[in-house]
Amino acid sequence: MTTRQPLYKSLYVQVIIAITIGILLGHYYPETGVALKPLGDGFVKLIKMVIAPIIFCTVVSGIAGMQSMKSVGKTGGYALLYFEIVSTIALIIGLVVVNVVKPGAGMHIDVSTLNASSVAAYAAAGAQQTTVGFLLNVIPNTVVGAFANGDILQVLMFSVLFGFALHRLGSYGKPLLDMIDRFAHVMFNIINMIMKLAPIGAFGAMAFTIGQYGVGSLVQLGYLMACFYITCLLFVLVVLGGICRAHGFSVLKLIRYIREELLIVLGTSSSESALPRMLAKMERLGAKKSVVGLVIPTGYSFNLDGTSIYLTMAAVFIAQATDTTMDITHQITLLLVLLVASKGAAGVTGSGFIVLAATLSAVGHLPVAGLALILGIDRFMSEARALTNLVGNAVATVVVAKWVKEMDNDKLASELASGGAPLVDARPTDDLGVAEGPAR
């Protein structure tokens, strides 16, 4: 009989307590809250430090260990098809909701009175983003540069090529594959150590957010925030819930299964902070390593459902607030531009805002200076974006794994039914689904 873990040792409980204390401290002692920003930044940097090698090990191990290379192409094709369909639905839902609710109507903002200097950096970066530029940026100048910069797509591309090459070596490459598997264990053990600091990181990030922006300053733009949060919630429950139901599992049970990762994202506002744990969690759920290694990292650029909702809502909100007319032609143009622009949202720093700036510039009809209207609340909306993105990628992994018949359905059912035990040891699993021992 297993002994139940004490409540105070649960990462889930620790992060909830840390976020609550951070909110209270930021509200009552804002200067102290702002000063705690390095705690959140430091935690996110620690996570980012090991993301590139973990993706490399997971993808290479998954691809090189597969029997047939055809299955890799099949998995990638199905994943991209799923990403395109679901993210397009997210864009359309955001567009419909903002047109029905009209959160910016009646503000009558004069564009000439806005402080455009506050968004100049975002606008300049956005103007440089092109489809061709984005595609070329996927190819790293050097392998070392891809890992040094922590560019997920560049690391992913090299990892896929490396995995294919290692697979072609057959038994000759087996010692190298074993070494990569052992190196992965070291990386996941580092993650285990870093995750013990998650409550501290969440505390510092939340204290800074509330201390810097306050709660009272949100009243004027609270309507847009409320609409966005409700839309994201409905998208998860209705759209993603419908997809889950059609594939034989519950989105609510899946959310319960990844609750610790969701709380980490809530505290840090960075979905990247949960990426290493998501790789381990989805594999433990029953998805094959090769599927998890392709779908999760790729989804961080191509399956950003929360960001897609945000982009259409924010763009039309700016038009409404500045009394800029947007007829059906303008809105279709906006949608078509975002279908391309949103796919590179994770490839740049300050991604959501830069992609939004690029979109406003490309459409031409909307004032880029209008970004100043939502600059102050963007940080508060980032939590909903990140949470929706994370749930979306979890659903995508299960669905794609089912499509390519690389999902252990019995394991999926049992893990979701049990709610998933806390991920004490975030290491990759062996073929039997049992965490392997440390390398000796």
Curated annotation (Swiss-Prot):
Give the record's keywords alphabetically. Answer: Cell inner membrane, Cell membrane, Membrane, Symport, Transmembrane, Transmembrane helix, Transport
Q: Note whether Phosphoprotein occurs among the keywords.
A: no
Q: Which residues cross the membrane?
A: 15-35, 46-66, 78-98, 146-166, 190-210, 224-244, 291-311, 332-352, 354-374
Q: Which PROSITE patterns match?
A: NA_DICARBOXYL_SYMP_1 (PS00713), NA_DICARBOXYL_SYMP_2 (PS00714)
Where is this chain's protein located in or outside the cell? Answer: Cell inner membrane
List, in alphabetical order, the GO biological process terms annotated in this UniProt record. Answer: L-aspartate transmembrane transport
Q: What membrane topology term does the record carry?
A: Multi-pass membrane protein
Region annotation Disordered: where it falls in the sequence: 421-440
> Which segment of the chain is annotated as a signal peptide?
none
GO CC terms of this entry? plasma membrane
Indicate whether Disulfide bond appears among the record's keywords: no
According to the UniProt entry, its GO molecular function terms are:
fumarate transmembrane transporter activity; malate:proton symporter activity; succinate transmembrane transporter activity
| Gene3D superfamilies (UniProt xref) | Sodium:dicarboxylate symporter
Pfam families attached to this UniProt entry: SDF (PF00375)
Family matches, as InterPro entries = C4_dicarb_transport, Na-dicarboxylate_symporter, Na-dicarboxylate_symporter_CS, Na:dicarbo_symporter_sf
Q: What does this protein do?
A: Responsible for the transport of dicarboxylates such as succinate, fumarate, and malate from the periplasm across the membrane.
Spell out the PANTHER family in the cross-references: AEROBIC C4-DICARBOXYLATE TRANSPORT PROTEIN, PROTON/GLUTAMATE-ASPARTATE SYMPORTER
Instruction: State the family it belongs to.
Output: Belongs to the dicarboxylate/amino acid:cation symporter (DAACS) (TC 2.A.23) family.
Q: Can you name this protein?
A: C4-dicarboxylate transport protein
Top-down, what is the taxonomic lineage of the species of origin? Bacteria, Pseudomonadati, Pseudomonadota, Gammaproteobacteria, Pseudomonadales
